Amino acid sequence: MTNKALVVVDMLYDFIDGSLACLNSEEAVRRTLEFIDSQTKEQGGEDHEILDMFPILFIRDHHPADHSSFKEQGGIWPAHCVAGTHGGDIHEDLLPYVSEELTFDKGCNKSVEQYSGYEGVNCAGQPMGEVLELLDTTDVYVCGIATEYCVRNTCEDLLKAGFKVHLLKDCIAYVDHDGHLKALEEMAQEGISIE
C-alpha cells in the first residue's frame, strides 16, 4: 500500500499578493484546492475526512521582524511573512485543511535563512520529516511557492530522506518564469517526479 501525503509550501499572503508576490500564485492555490478535491473523491470520502485518508502538511515561513534575510538587515529580500502578520498567514481558502499538528514553521531563527520546510517544526517541536515517518509516508506530493527556492529545497530534502517526491507543476508559483523552468528541469534530473 502506498501511503501518500501532500506538502503545501508557503501558500502565504506575502507570496500571493504581498511584499514578495510570485507569478501564478492565485492559480497555484486554486489548482491545489482542485487536487485536494480530486484526492477526496479518489479516496471515496467526504471533505472533512480527507486529513485522515491523505494527510496535508503545511510549511510556513515564520520570520521575526528583524530576520537577517530582510533588506533592512542587509539581506536580499523585502520583509515578508513576519510572524503574527497577515502576510504570514496561510491563504484563507486552504484553512479548512490546516491543523496545528501538521503545520511546520521555518525561518524562525533571525540569523538563519531556511528555504527547505523539511526541518520546519510543528507546535510540538517535531520536524516535518519525523512526522512524515510517523505517518508511514512513502510518497510525498508537493505544491506551493516558490519553485526556485522553498519548493525546490523542500523537494530535494524529501528526496534525500528517501521519500518518493511528486511535484505538482500546476500547483506551484514562482519568482521568475525562466528560473522556474530551469528548476523543474534540474529537479526532474535529480529524480523528482514532475506531474
What are the functions of these language-model segments?
Residues H91-I145:
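Internal catalytic-core helix/loop-beta-alpha segment
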